[in-house]
Amino acid sequence: MAKTLYEKVFDAHVVYEGKNELPILYIDRHLIHEVTSPQAFSGLKMAKRRMARADLTLATIDHDVSTKSVDLNACSDMAKEQITTLMQNTKEFGVRLLGLGDKNQGIVHIVSPELGFTLPGVTLVCGDSHTATHGAFGALAFGIGTSEVEHVMATQTLKQAKLKTMKIECKGQFQKGVYAKDLILYLIAQYGTAKGTGYAIEFCGELIRNLSMEARMTLCNMAIEFGAKVGMIAPDEITFEYIKGKEFAPKGEEFQKYCEYWKSLRSDEGAKYDESITLDVSKIKPQISYGTNPSQVIGIDEKIPKISDFKNQSEQKSLLDALSYVNLEQDQVIEGVKIDIVFIGSCTNGRLEDLKIAADILKGRKIHKNVKALIVPGSMQVRKEAENLGLDKIFIEAGCEWRYAGCSMCLGMNDDKANSGQRVASTSNRNFVGRQGKGSITHLMSPASAAACAIEGVICDNRKYLGV
């Protein structure tokens, strides 16, 4: 029977399936961080259990950490407590921790691929909603709750219902100034934040095959904003080249054997999906969010919708509520809206390729005098590689702040926050009410668009800086 990529990986990991019971999956990789792990470790201690496979668990510090310094004392009191607790727990249970000062510390969904801990065909979980990022490698990766974190720690297994499958085929090529971030924002804008609910989605097609691993991770990262639990891309030579030589990757002849197996991790010809979507990506323009959920997105040359554009009363109310919060109007042109802060980073767009894209636009230019711009590499490895290329100098000379690795302004859990009423051009993944600080206003966009906004101090078209 022909199978999809998702079905192949899922079926290969079922260790038990009783009558009228959910299948039990073996979990190959478990990522943990300081926010969703303390209760799980406490549960293990109370039950006097050890971890089933501490060697298949990797911990990092990312959500709470200060990006101004690698000194623990630079963090808030709550952050210090959570970080110290993780340090103690990982030491007690024998889990490798990428702690403050570690050359590999950074955002969980960036450091795992960097180290080759994420591999094609594995099952991977983390107490974080953006775990779908790792599906870019052909891994079956999804976020779990804290009680499930404890269960995986104790048993290295998890009960999981089998999801429906959706194919998203991307045809054509991007216009100049359009990136993977624009594609995923466009997809969510067209179909809504619930379209993927109950599905494992697979991105495929001509465009996907030509994307870098960084761009593929951006796509899969925001599968959750599309409503999907899982986003996957079949591994190929680009994947294998990215993995080769990394710390946890197979070595030598073993690597070649794995590559032969990984080549089988693609949907069979004739495999049936429960739903399919085909996109012509050549029509997509730089995308900007205008509201308070990731489906409220328009092209840079478009106007904010009018209430009459929606027939559904709940959508009409959502529009009015969003515009009231973000202080914008129906039928308003999005280009030219004043920006206070620019944030380039996060598990969506904090990789070296993202920083290169931003640096290409900022090189030789200055940011607007009324703009504060934070450039936050997703890991210390990204930071080092960027500095080796001189990107830090480009950012600093432009007037940006060059920070250490962490989740930073993606969420209001650390010191990097916007004040009430401040408008942020952000490369993160969510624009919810207060997401970047109480009363803050978020506009999601690509690193190129964010860099252009930093220069002009308003939402603008990045293509003018690319000779388009």
UniProtKB/Swiss-Prot annotation:
Tell me which domain of life the UniProt entry assigns to the organism this sequence originates from: Bacteria
- Which enzyme class, named as a word? lyase
- Annotated [4Fe-4S] cluster binding lies at C347, C407, C410
Write one Gene Ontology MF term.
3-isopropylmalate dehydratase activity
| Entry keyword annotation includes Protein biosynthesis | no
EC number, UniProt record: 4.2.1.33
- Cofactor(s) required, per the database record: [4Fe-4S] cluster
Keywords of the record: 4Fe-4S, Amino-acid biosynthesis, Branched-chain amino acid biosynthesis, Iron, Iron-sulfur, Leucine biosynthesis, Lyase, Metal-binding
What InterPro entries does the database record attribute to this sequence? 3-IsopropMal_deHydase_lsu (IPR004430), Acnase/IPM_dHydase_lsu_aba_1/3 (IPR015931), Acoase/IPM_deHydtase_lsu_aba (IPR001030), Aconitase_4Fe-4S_BS (IPR018136), Aconitase_4Fe-4S_dom (IPR036008), IPM_dehydratase_rel_enz (IPR050067), IPMI_cat (IPR033941)
* HAMAP family with a match to the protein in the record: LeuC_type1
Described purpose of this protein according to its UniProt entry: Catalyzes the isomerization between 2-isopropylmalate and 3-isopropylmalate, via the formation of 2-isopropylmaleate.
| PANTHER family found in the cross-reference section | 3-ISOPROPYLMALATE DEHYDRATASE, HOMOACONITASE, MITOCHONDRIAL-RELATED
Q: Which family does it belong to?
A: Belongs to the aconitase/IPM isomerase family. LeuC type 1 subfamily.
Write the protein's name: 3-isopropylmalate dehydratase large subunit
| Species in which this protein is naturally found | Campylobacter jejuni subsp. jejuni serotype O:23/36 (strain 81-176)
